[in-house]
Structure formats: structure tokens, C-alpha cells
Amino acid sequence: MTQPSNPPGAQNDAARVLVTGANGQIGRRLIERLARSNPPVPVRAAVRSARAAETLEALPEEIRPEICVVDYRNAGELAEAARDCRYAVHLVGILKETATSRYEDAHEASTRAIADAAATAGLRRIVYLSILGSDPKSSNACLASKGRAEQILLDAKTPALILRVPMVIGPGDVTANIVLREALSRALPLAAGGRSRTQPIYAGDLIEAIAAGLERDDLDDLILDLAGPESLPQREFIERAARLYGRRPHIVSIPTGLILFIAGLAERFFTNPAITKTALEVILADDDVDPEPARQKLGIDLTSLDEILRRCVGPQATQRE
């Protein structure tokens, strides 16, 4: 493990938070949110490579965290990274397996390591980001792996808050750019004509949920299904985004089985296909949960779908970030 790099003005603080997978979009948003808290919450960001560390080193000085490079599967390295921290936020995870990145390593192994590290370091709580539908008994390899990771945390010594979320969308992020591209398409092929239900949550709301997990006392050993306030078919979601531009794409219905078959073939003939059958199954799964229990438990507000689209996809959002 590389030793943490201390940003200017860094201070030791009992409320320090270890964030794993901190170089991703959610991690960077969380770092900024905590840095701008009153008082600021110091963050130690754990990443797995020097290249990932460079992403965080490029952040503005006033929000730049301590940075350390670790092996997410190494409990000893994570325990050292967690020294002097009170909480950990575990954001490590993948949707698509590759030849060098497997579900077992990204989910179960990394979660087992952070659980062991948290016990060694005496952390107060781990906040874990999971996926709606995660279940050890799932027939989907990704959701089953996530479900096993959840169980590791529930069985661990350190209390955990598990947040299961659907699609997360924020200004300027990859998801927002994909939705914008689809909304502006003249013709858009969608599995089953876009009948699968989606329930996107605003990235800022998720960040507030994670922050609540670092601030509230009544969130130990909980699994919360957290989603946006509205569930609707994918087709309607894209059409609503398109209306912000006075557009309406022509939806071309493609049989779901055919899409999954093609994805399966791609896995057989390419070492790193753009999408896999397993990842597609997660993307096409129906997201339709009641977010109110989680919202109330966390004490947060949820941004309406129309406001999400305005901020992330609408004409005023296209130049952001």
C-alpha cells in the first residue's frame, strides 16, 4: 500500500471517513460533499492504481482528499488505510466482468477485506453501495455476487448500512450522456420496446443518503431499497427526456431474447465485449420499489424525475461538468 498523501491543511479528525473506489463518479461527488460540510469531514480515499489516484490528485485543492493506493482484497492494507477513521464507505463494485475483473474479487473478496479491516481499525460503521435486486439466490451472477457481499457485511463485527440503488444519474456523468444521446436519436432500438421499468435516483440524493449513513445513529445493519420517486417504462423515460428538446424518437422494438443472445455470442468471441449478457439482465430488470421507507429512515428528500431530467439532460445541463 502506498502511504496516504496529505493535502494542504489536512488534519487528524475522529470523524475521518475512508472511501474505497473513491475515483469513480459517486466517490468524487461524495468527497466534495464531505469537504464542503460544516465543519468539513476529512476523507482518506482508497484507490487501486496510480492512474486512479491521479484522478483525485486533479481535484481542486480545497476538496482534495488524502489518497492511498491499496489492493481492495488485502485486509491488512485496508486496515492501515482505515487507521484513525471512524467510518468507511465501500463503493467498489462492477456491473460487467472482464478477464481481469471478476465479480468474486470486486464484490465478495473486497467486502470481506473491508469488513476485516473495519474490525481491526475499530470503525463505527460501513456504508455499502449495492444494487436493487441483489440476492445470494439470484440466477444473475452479478446480483448473486452483490447479495453474497451484503451477507458478508451483515455477518461481520462492524455494523453496516447497505443501500441498494437502481440507475444513478447526475449532471455530466456517463448515464446522463447516454440518456441525452438516446433522447436526441431519430430512431432508438430498445429491448421489448422499452417496457422494462426504470426508477432513476438523482446522484445528489444518493450522496445525501450516504452522508446520512455517516451522521445518524439508527442505521446499523440495515438494507434499504433506495430509488427515485417515480418508476416508469424505459420508453416513457426516454420520451420525457426528449420532450425537453421538442423531440420524440421513433422506438424500434427488439426482442429481449435476441439482444441477450447476441450479448452471449459477443462474450464467446471477444475478450472484452462492450456489454455482457449478465450486465444486460441487470440493466433490463424492472426497478419498481417504494422509496418512502428508505427516504424516511435516512431523513433525506428525493428529487422528482422531471427535475432530475432538467438538471442532468435538459438544454441547460448539457454544458455542465
Question: Where in the sequence are the language-model features?
Answer:
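N-terminal Rossmann NAD(P)H-binding glycine-rich loop of SDR-like oxidoreductase domains
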Residues: 9-40
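Oxidoreductase cofactor-interface core, primarily capturing Rossmann-like NAD(P)-dependent enzymes
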Residues: 13, 136-247
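Mid/C-terminal beta-alpha module of Rossmann-like enzyme folds, strongest
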Residues: 9, 15, 212-276, 289-321
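A short helix->loop->beta-strand "cap" motif at the edges of active sites that frequently abuts
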Residues: 121-125, 158
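NAD(P)H-binding glycine-rich loop region in Rossmannoid oxidoreductase-like domains
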Residues: 51, 55, 60-113, 117-119, ...
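Residues forming the Rossmann-fold NAD(P)(H) cofactor-binding site
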Residues: 28, 108, 147
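Conserved glycine-rich Rossmann-like NAD(P)H-binding loop of the short-chain dehydrogenase/reductase
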Residues: 39-51
